[in-house]
Amino acid sequence: FKTPSREAEFYKKTEQEKIQAESTSKEIMLYRIPNDGHKILFVHGWNGRSSQFYRIIELLSDNGYDITAVDLPGHGRSTRSITNLPEITDLVSEITKSRGPYHGIICHSFGGVAALNAVRLGATFQKLVLISPGVYEIKPMFKTFVGLFGLDEEYYADRLFDLAESLYGASPGEFGLDRFSNQIETETLIVHCVDDKEAKKEIAVTLHSDMKNTVLHLTEGLGHRRILRDEKVAELVMNFL
């Protein structure tokens, strides 16, 4: 994979450190821009990388925010391997404990699911920013996968749930935002594009309804990823923080 030229400046401006995370056997790449202001953690989405946040990170760091961004296992410049939601959740929790406390966490797509699960398990932030949240319930994902093979969706999704629980010690359904989002009281900004073809805007609308302290901002014409490099979105995020 060749990094887009627009993201090259991100790698020039950040301090880079590979760490051996206790929550995983993999080496994890962290990116830092130290500053005297509030500490902010960035968590990208599935098939993403930290450099996708370059626009928001540049604006925040130029305004004194202290930046940490993480390439998740199997992504970016971290160890190339498979990963899963429980592992990513544990990693976010670990970084929060070892490198925090963080004033805010900014997440894209699937990264928001991991971040909210970390909050469920005890991580604390003053501000949450969810950009293009991508998953609300877990089981429909399993059923969609099974359906691709023409199999009985309900039966085989249940079998996959059983297998995952035996491997990870928790039912995949427990990680679904439908199970706990109404218990999260952290002040949250949700930003979503109405024409996002990868994550339906209804996910953002539902989270806004579920959660107790949210601001919902809907955009147009920015899709699922271009939203991360939009200047107005970056300014919106900074003003919220």
Task: List the model feature ranges, each with a label.
Residues 222-232:
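Catalytic histidine-centered segment of alpha/beta-hydrolase-like enzymes
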Residues 123-170:
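Hydrolase active-site cap/lid region
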Residues 183-185, 190-192, 196:
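Short beta-strand/loop motif that positions the catalytic acidic residue
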Residues 1-20:
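An N-terminal hydrophobic leader/cap segment in hydrolases
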Residues 106-115:
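Gly/Ala-rich beta-loop-alpha elbow adjacent to hydrolase catalytic centers
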Residues 82-103:
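Alpha/beta-hydrolase active-site loop
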Residues 56, 177, 186, 200-209:
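Short alpha-helix in the alpha/beta-hydrolase fold that links the catalytic acid
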Residues 50, 57-79:
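Conserved alpha/beta-hydrolase
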